[in-house]
Amino acid sequence: MMSKLGVLLITCLLLFPLTAVPLDGDQPADQPAERLQDDISSENHPFFDPVKRCCRLLCLSCNPCCG
């Protein structure tokens, strides 16, 4: 009886391996790098000066401010 259960278990594992089970690893919360790419940073702001690495005008939505 136990050998039949063992054969059934091995057969099931061969037909349906655990790697075939879909994991939730593709959820956005598990991929912080992609979330950071979607973030709008000050460097993309139209008033950002890349030479001085600060914002020239209207520093309300852009940091750091050149002053």
Curated annotation (Swiss-Prot):
**Keyword list, A-Z:** Amidation, Cleavage on pair of basic residues, Disulfide bond, Hydroxylation, Secreted, Signal, Toxin
Any Pfam family the entry gives: Conotoxin
Query: A GO molecular function for this record?
Result: ion channel inhibitor activity
- Reported tissue expression: Expressed by the venom duct.
Cysteine amide: residues carrying this PTM: 66
4-hydroxyproline: residues bearing it: 64
Where, subcellularly, is it found? Answer: Secreted
Q: Which domain of life is it from?
A: Eukaryota
- GO CC terms, sorted: extracellular region
| Signal sequence bounds | 1-20
Note the pro-peptide positions. 21-53
Which family does the record claim for this protein?
Belongs to the conotoxin M superfamily.
Q: What is this protein called?
A: Conotoxin TxMMSK-01
Please name the taxonomic classification of the source.
Eukaryota, Metazoa, Spiralia, Lophotrochozoa, Mollusca
